[in-house]
Amino acid sequence: MFKKLFRQDENILNSELAEDLPIPRHVAIIMDGNGRWAKKRFLPRIAGHKEGMDVVKRVTRYANAIGIDVLTLYAFSTENWKRPTDEVDFLMKLPVEFFDSFVPELIEENVRVNVMGYRENLPDHTMRAVEKAIADTAHCTGLTLNFALNYGGRSEIITAAKEAMKELELEGKSADDLTEEKLNDHLMSSGLGDPDLLIRTSGELRLSNFMLWQLAYSEFYFTDTHWPDFSKEDFLQAIIEYQNRSRRFGGL
C-alpha cells in the first residue's frame, strides 16, 4: 500500500514540475502554526501537533517522490522547553508514536532517519525511539529524513567551534588555522549539505534560531498556510518557486 501511495505521488508531482529546471537537493522546513491551527478550531494545542505529525508523513512522501535527497524538519527547538509542561510532555511522546508507525514504511521506501540536536537532553523514552529509528534505517540509501530535535542554531555553532578548536590543538595548530570547512565538519548537519530551499509555514518571517550557518545562501519561501493545512499543492508551489529563481551565491 505504501509503495502505491509513493508511486501515485511521484506521478502527480513530477507531472507538474519543469523537467529542465533543477529541484532542490536539500529542503528544510520550519513547521510553524500547529497551535494557531488548533486555536482556530477551538481545539487544544496538542491537537495541532498531532495533525502536524500526519503532515510530516505526507510531505516525506512528496519529497521522496520528486527525488529530493535530504528533508530537514524543525521539530523541537532548545527554546521550546519553555512551553507548558503538558505540551512539552506530549511533544516528547510524538516521536515514539511517529517512528513506531512510520519506520517500517520508510524502510520499504529506502528512507534513512537522522536526528540532529542535543539528544542527550531528551527524555529516555524519546531517546530510545530516536536511536531505534536511526539504527533501523541506517542501511537505507535514499532520502534522508532529518529531524532537528532539541536543536538551536547558535548553540550548534558554538559547539562546533569548540570541537574544531580542540581538533586543531591536537594537530598542533592555532585558531588562525580555523576554516569554514573545518567548522562545517563539526556541525550537526555535517555530511548532509546546506539546504537549497527553506520553507516556513504560518506566515512568520524569521528563522527562529534554525540552521543559522547553513542557510547563508539558501532560497527562502514563506507561506501563510499553517503546517497542519500544508498540502501537496503548497509543497509543489514552493518547489516551483525555487525552480524559477536564479541562485547567485553572492555573484552576479
UniProtKB/Swiss-Prot annotation:
EC main group: transferase
UniProt-annotated binding residues for substrate: 33-37, 45, 49, 77-79, 81, 83, 200, 206-208
InterPro entries named among the record's database cross-references: UPP_synth-like, UPP_synth-like_CS, UPP_synth-like_sf
Presence of keyword Magnesium: yes
GO process terms (BP): polyprenol biosynthetic process
Any one GO CC term of the record: cytosol
EC number per UniProt: 2.5.1.-
Active site: D32, N80
Alphabetical keyword list: Magnesium, Metal-binding, Transferase
Binding site for Mg(2+): D32, E219
Pfam families named among the record's database cross-references: Prenyltransf (PF01255)
Cofactor needs: Mg(2+)
Textual note on the cofactor: Binds 2 magnesium ions per subunit.
GO molecular function: ditrans,polycis-undecaprenyl-diphosphate synthase [(2E,6E)-farnesyl-diphosphate specific] activity; magnesium ion binding; manganese ion binding
UniProt xrefs under HAMAP family: ISPT (MF_01139)
Record family assignment: Belongs to the UPP synthase family.
Biological function: Catalyzes the condensation of isopentenyl diphosphate (IPP) with allylic pyrophosphates generating different type of terpenoids.
Subunit-level organization: Homodimer.
Name of the protein in question: Isoprenyl transferase
Source species: Listeria monocytogenes serovar 1/2a (strain ATCC BAA-679 / EGD-e)
